[in-house]
Amino acid sequence: VRHRHLSTLALALGIAVLLDVLRVWLPSVITLFGRAAETPAELLGAFALGWFLLALAAPTLVRRAGSGPVGLVAAGVLAAARLALTAQPGGPAQLWLACAGLLAGLVWLAAVAASVPRPAAGLALGLAGNAVGHALLGTEDLVWRGGALGWSLSALLVAAFLAASTVARRRRPAASAGVGDGDAAPHMRTPGRRAWLLCGPALLLASQVALAPALWNAAAGTGSPDFPGLARPGNGVLPGAFAVLLFLATALFRAPLRLARVVWPLALLAGSVLFVTGRLVPAYLLTAAGLGGCLALADSAAADERPAGDVRAGARRGRAAALGMLVFAVATVAYYAAYDLGYPNGWAPVATALLVALVAVGASLRSVPAVPGATSSAPVLPTLVRVAALGGLTALAGLAATLHVPPTNARAATAPAAVRVAAYNIRMGFGLDGRLDLDAVARELHGSDVILLSEVDRGWWLNGGHDTLALLAGRLGMPYVFAPAADPVWGDAVLSRFPARSGQTRRLTAHGAPTGAQALGVTLDLGGRELAVVATHLQPPPGRDPVEQAREVAEFARRYANGRPLVVGGDLNTEPDDPAFAEFTGAGLVDALAPARPLRTSPADDPRTQIDHVFVSPGLTAAEVRAPRTGASDHLPVTLTVTLP
């Protein structure tokens, strides 16, 4: 029994460490190995999938060298890589450290699977624990925080993982006698194989939907009648705590089998469908309940199957774990590559959920009565431990809601004679060195009164699952209005020191562009007078200027302003001599950056193109126009002072 408890603890801690590495590795692929929207998505996907294909050899290594030695060595490499990443090396060092940590983590999973036939409790606690930690940190990982807090907590996590792994290995019972490497009965089932197959899909569904604190936040600020289809500052961690409660309750406590076979798979499928249709709150709640229940279903089946503690059974579980992680990689690449290649991607989360549901139901239907010597069907953890874990993690998730209070709406003041405006494509908060450095972004925007942001990420798992908008708004002390573009958690935003009274969004027609785009209009109260602001990020069709989208934005902006002073800006992906640029000037708008032309903003390390722009309505004048050199993004920000009439 103690061995089971230690193995469960070691697995939970290892999952948390592996998720930390994945939160660095995924964005490193698209910022360091290549650049999203520049490097072919096929090449990025091939590089990412290659590591998971390489890990398919891990079960053979485990079978030949033994799960104990391989598991401990892999755990050591995983822990060392995780700790080294806390130094935030950036550049190639970050990429290859993360790759080494990922591969070690995949080998470690195969080794653990060889000796742990019932992983559901460990997987559930690891997923929930990592999510709660992410929420407590405001979605900014320890790896990116650094400093005394980052190093001390990282060292504590890594030390606990290594200690639990070492002690669990020492107390692990020997493999079952009587069934050797080569004479295992071919008809004998392998306990835990299906449960391990769910490891990878569960990691994805939890990190992308069910247990994603950034997604909780993004969903919390919606629903205002003055801002239809938009999001304001909101704290979604409290309802997120309910998702943690649902997930752990269904994963650690079994419902009646006949009921569970129907309710949990249906809940999981419904949650995935709601996610791809943009209904985020019911999506993550249903996915959390369904995912936990499906893990419990697979675990119950593993408990009832015949014993197979030999080397061959361990290898089968290891292969299942490796295949499950390959599913994780394929589904992740398939979902996010669509934003570069332009195909529908809603099927990816739904297909992943369907796979989990089918495996869980199939496993429960194949369960047989326990036989002498079979693994006990009792829960892996005693009731007191399960209740304590459920209550403790749920309470900590609720505590996170009090630690990260979003900025409140600014008060109206005396009408200013001028406002300081900035427009910045922040590339999800990642700098040229591949590090998430929102402090650097905030430094570039400090002192601005109105900020127009492009490529704002509020929870993409591909980027590590951060709410970059909330983190940046907290640093600047500025409320925001967010408009979805590519999907509900990726788009454009306006931050302002002045109160935002209302807002609108207009989805732009794709015209062949693979990534979604929109135009966000926000009305600001400047103390007795109003300023209309429009933020957008035009997406050019392959090989063409975004003329049609520029025309749509210009028409929307003119109509939205309705005679009020107007500022329009963002990453427009067009040069001053291009037809799309002329759509704005032809609509009567004035190039606010003209006094400083040429003002090249991209790429940030060698600016050659003028694609980030700000336009104003006639009567407004611009001065102090700058594009300061910085590596905080792959674009340079543009800043200017706009004098009001």
Regions found by a protein language model. Name each.
Residues 5, 20-31, 45-51, 61-71, ...:
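Metal-dependent phosphoester-hydrolase catalytic domains
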Residues 446, 450, 473-477, 500, ...:
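Sec-exported extracytoplasmic/periplasmic mature domains
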Residues 426, 456, 537-538, 570-572:
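Active-site metal-binding loops of divalent metal-dependent hydrolases
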Residues 429-431, 458-462, 487-489, 541-543, ...:
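Active-site environment of divalent metal-dependent phosphoester hydrolases
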Residues 392-471:
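Membrane-interface segments at or immediately adjacent to transmembrane helices
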Residues 521-525, 532-534, 546-572, 580-584:
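His/acidic metal-ligating clusters that form di-metal
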Residues 434-437, 441, 465-468, 472, ...:
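Stable alpha-helical elements in mature extracytoplasmic
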Residues 342, 346-348, 405-408, 433, ...:
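Structured beta-strand-rich core segments of catalytic domains in phosphoester-bond hydrolases
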